[in-house]
């Protein structure tokens, strides 16, 4: 799962937002970015930043939606009990994956350049992460779930065209397929990551 590291690092850098939500997806991302810069460049202990990140991420990212998508075809064949177990494990996995890399970015600068409504439920916000010392400019596209305009949620982001959700789906499905379709093999991988 190391292939997702850069995506998780970038995701953590921009998931700090206020409890209220902007109705406009571009405004939502701008709000997230502005506050992320303040929090990540502060002198707060890393532990404090992680607590804030996890609390806010649960409100600004559709973790459950991403988790069910990453199960792919298996979400239709597993029992409700296994589905519930997976959702809990994925949430813990997801939060630990990016919060543990919080310190990788201290003052991200990102500019929202455009947005495009692709359906009644989704809007894509296009942005650029400015180049910094040792880091090139990066194109980031945010997939915002806007079915409830009062509470838009991040459901995916594409870094230079690479989708976080799709990449995770491929990795999870590979684990299950390589273990004869046994969902418990994925549970084991997630549990090992969470406790290490």
Predicted regions mapped to residue ranges:
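Short beta-strand edge/turn micro-motifs at domain boundaries
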Residues: 137-166
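Sec/Tat signal peptide C-region and signal peptidase I cleavage site
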Residues: 17-22
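Surface-exposed, charged secondary-structure patches
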Residues: 96-138, 189, 193-196
